[in-house]
Design a protein with these regions (language model features):
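Ankyrin-repeat boundary/"N-cap" motif
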Residues: 1-6, 29-44, 68-85, 109-124
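Ankyrin-repeat-protein effector appendages
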Residues: 1-6, 128-145
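Helix-turn-helix repeat elements of alpha-solenoid scaffolds
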Residues: 10-17, 52-56
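Ankyrin repeat domain, specifically the short helix-to-loop turn at the C-terminus of the second helix
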Residues: 19-27, 54-64, 94-105, 134-144
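Acidic (E/D-rich), amphipathic helical modules within compact regulatory domains
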Residues: 40, 44-50, 57
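Residues within HEAT/ARM-like alpha-solenoid scaffolds
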Residues: 46-50, 71-72, 87-94, 129, ...
């Protein structure tokens, strides 16, 4: 994959690719994708360790974890569960923990009336037993059912 801008880097690159393009604004918005940098950082699980570094950095820089995509009104947690269909369970839990610790609204309803937990249950294609720790973590932190 050829990395040509910050949006390519945050979505498909490494932490170093991302840093090569980062200009100091953690809340840049890609009007074509309809997502913020933080949201784009969780649309796939390519280079999971790098994604975690990028996500941590964006959070530390003040990225808005509750920014809603204009089209579907989804926050980063909705987008992660809806986009990454077969994540490694530990990666899924780590992304969930980072976003919740940063203050993401786990009960925010999107345009379709769904909260992130609903996408974790219906969109993620892993056995329930495998990702039960994620469900439990969300519920322990106050997620509605």
């Amino acid at each position: 994959m050829r990395i040509t801008d910050i949006f390519d880097a945050v979505r498909d690159g490494t932490y170093f690719d991302f840093m090569d393009f980062y200009s100091g604004n953690p809340n840049l918005f890609n009007k074509y994708a309809g997502m913020s940098l933080l949201q784009l950082s969780v649309v796939n699980d390519r280079y999971p360790d790098e994604k975690i570094k990028i996500l941590r950095f964006l959070i530390s820089e003040g990225a808005d974890v509750n920014f809603l995509s204009p089209k579907d009104q989804r926050n980063a947690l909705h987008i992660f569960y809806f986009s990454v269909l077969r994540p490694e369970p530990q990666y899924m839990l780590k992304i969930t923990q980072l976003l919740i610790a940063a203050g993401v609204d786990i009960n925010k309803k999107d345009k379709y009336g769904a909260i992130p937990l609903q996408y974790a249950i219906t969109a993620v294609k892993l056995p329930t037993k495998t990702i039960m720790p994620v469900y439990q973590y969300l519920m322990d932190r106050g997620s509605n059912m």
